[in-house]
């Protein structure tokens, strides 16, 4: 049931592996480009220091092209391997974390965002909120402690409730980093 207090909203539900995985992929997409460029720089530096291997004889331009392609392919492979290792670590951490999988209720009011469960009760005041992002199926609320609050859209019972959530966020936060779907292109 939707429960409306004067200026609050309650969102009960359980966070699934699919919800957390979506946040993981949004975060990993940003850092994967960095790792790819880092591996390219490392492989280029190694090739430059050790000398370029002679893959094609007779054409320096073709040899340089082939070495560049080798660097790109190796960088892609190492980046994918690193991302796979991070994903395995992430999925194991989720499976072991009972707190993450437990049923919870998010309450947004004038105080801040309260997360209640059988095992814990957390309150994040509005001044702790540094950014809010809306993705396809989830909201990510960043906090000043470097953590984030993931609120899946399936916790909302209607579009009206989701709009009230956005209004409460806009009214109570001073952060300029609010990116709701209408703002994203």
Swiss-Prot record:
Subcellular localization, as worded in the UniProt entry: Cell membrane
InterPro entries cross-referenced by the UniProt entry: YcxB-like_C
Pfam families the UniProt entry points to: YcxB
Cell membrane found in the keyword field: yes
Entry superkingdom: Bacteria
Listed GO CC annotations: plasma membrane
Membrane topology: Multi-pass membrane protein
UniProt keyword annotations, A-Z: Cell membrane, Membrane, Transmembrane, Transmembrane helix
Name of the protein: Uncharacterized protein YcxB
Gene this chain is encoded by: ycxB
């Amino acid at each position: 049931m939707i429960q409306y207090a004067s200026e609050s909203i309650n969102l009960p539900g359980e966070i699934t592996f699919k919800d957390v995985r979506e946040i993981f992929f949004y975060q990993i997409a940003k850092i994967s480009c960095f790792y790819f460029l880092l591996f390219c720089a490392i492989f280029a530096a190694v090739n430059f220091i050790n000398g370029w291997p002679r893959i094609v004889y007779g054409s320096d331009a073709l040899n340089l092209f082939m070495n560049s392609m080798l660097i790109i392919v190796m960088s892609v492979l190492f980046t994918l391997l690193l991302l796979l290792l991070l994903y395995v670590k992430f999925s194991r951490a989720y499976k072991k974390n009972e707190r993450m999988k437990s049923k919870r209720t998010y309450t947004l009011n004038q105080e801040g965002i309260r997360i209640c469960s059988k095992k814990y009760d957390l309150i994040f005041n509005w001044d702790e909120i540094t950014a809010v992002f809306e993705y396809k199926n989830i909201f990510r609320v960043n906090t000043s402690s470097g953590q984030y609050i993931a609120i899946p859209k399936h916790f909302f019972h209607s579009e009206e409730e989701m709009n009230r959530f956005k209004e409460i966020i806009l009214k109570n936060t001073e952060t300029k980093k609010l990116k709701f779907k209408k703002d994203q292109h």
